[in-house]
Amino acid sequence: GRILLGGGGGSLNAMIQASAPDQVGDDDKKAFRKRAEEIVAAGAVAFGEIALHHLSLRLMGPQHPYEWTPPDHPLLLLLADIAAEKNIPMDLHLDLVPEDMNLPDRPAFNSTNPAVLKANLATFERLLAHNRGARIVWAHAGTDPLGTRPPPIQRELLTRNPNLFMSLRLGGNAPPPVFALDTDKKLKLSWLALLRDYPDRFVIGTDYFHTVQSGPQRGPGEETLANYRAALAQMPPELAKAIAHGNAERIYRLGDQ
């Protein structure tokens, strides 16, 4: 097998987070484009993971960051243009907030999260509409820590935005209520219907990350893989094949590598 990499999570993402939207100038855009083109030249098959809204979760430790930027940030719009130009997708992390809301009082969240979360649904759709040639992969479908990303909202967004794709994250161990799987690892009917209605828009995503500082690392554990196998086994064969590998091969142009 082969390993093909995305890039920009440690550089483009940092440049976006460090730039106030109303302070982005031509020099900032030039430096951002230069870095993005270096990533493409190095062989990346995607830009990302780029954090638009990233909650800090206790399970990931106290160092797990809270990150926020408006999805219609000028550098994100520029990245969409570059992604369309270079014909590679953008992988985005967006914990969805349809309208301003209080952070739910749940033990899952670290204290570094703000008490009030800003709406980002409308600005996310502005990013999607900015350049329809940009393939945008919204990460972690099937995991919903805020309870704001149920199948009906995703169905509406997929219908309105033909350049929107999603990667599934089904996690390990017994899934909580906000997962696409129930506690018996049965794929919820609302999720199965969504996948069947949009068979070319979903891929598998394990959400495992690796850094050069942290020493030996491993991929997804057996519990996580078991969840994916269980979900795929409950789908029609052609749908399972598309989600397991066919869609990723097309969206990320893996056959061209």
Name the predicted role of every residue range.
Residues 189, 196-203, 209-257:
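Mid-to-C-terminal alpha-helical segments outside catalytic/metal-binding sites
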Residues 31-35, 78, 123-126, 153, ...:
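Extracytoplasmic/secreted proteins, especially bacterial periplasmic and envelope-associated proteins
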Residues 39, 47, 83, 140, ...:
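Conserved, mostly hydrophobic/aromatic
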